[in-house]
């Protein structure tokens, strides 16, 4: 059994496990918990009644957080020639082609998001086993396989995040930092919840979003009533 710190136990005592909170209430409760000497990350976690093994129930997409994540993403771009120059000018942190592909194949993973031009995907596809499990594989559906590398890089730097349901039907989102105002965290949470609801597969009958939680790096999760997200 994991031994929790005194601060964690104190925070956990504030959460009524017989109650489901609104997002506003959950965020306010989270911010009232004991503080730490660093700016904690705040996350939202959803449980969906989907079967990710079925292609038509693999919920994935992107969402632009109105207040960003509180973290500037390190963006890697696979491109060559003028598009490589364009990516660098747009603010990409790492840009390259064949040599960079080899570097990633060799274990280099110091980046948070990946963009590729379509002509690079034949070779980038070899990185599926490296990037896929980490949710980093470029995909046209999420705007990360594109000729408009400027827009892709600026969107990611501006707070655009990519998500994909895991094998257990869970979705996790970074929605900001504990230093954010409650209203900013609430608006970021609403943005991700609205996008998840919009992507409900037509083959899913009955309740789709079955559980929601807001949590932070060092504190327990606060359960949010899914009915308040309708």
Swiss-Prot record:
The keyword RNA-binding applies. The keyword tRNA-binding applies. InterPro entries: Ribosom_uL1_bac-type, Ribosomal_uL1, Ribosomal_uL1-like, Ribosomal_uL1/biogenesis, Ribosomal_uL1_3-a/b-sand, Ribosomal_uL1_CS. This is Large ribosomal subunit protein uL1. It comes from Bifidobacterium longum (strain NCC 2705). HAMAP family: Ribosomal_uL1_B. Gene3D superfamilies: 3.30.190.20, 3.40.50.790. Binds directly to 23S rRNA. The L1 stalk is quite mobile in the ribosome, and is involved in E site tRNA release. PROSITE patterns: RIBOSOMAL_L1. GO terms for molecular function: rRNA binding; structural constituent of ribosome; tRNA binding. Part of the 50S ribosomal subunit. Coiled coil: none annotated. One of its GO terms (biological process) is regulation of translation. It holds the Pfam family Ribosomal_L1. Keywords: Repressor, Ribonucleoprotein, Ribosomal protein, RNA-binding, rRNA-binding, Translation regulation, tRNA-binding. GO terms for cellular component: large ribosomal subunit. Belongs to the universal ribosomal protein uL1 family.
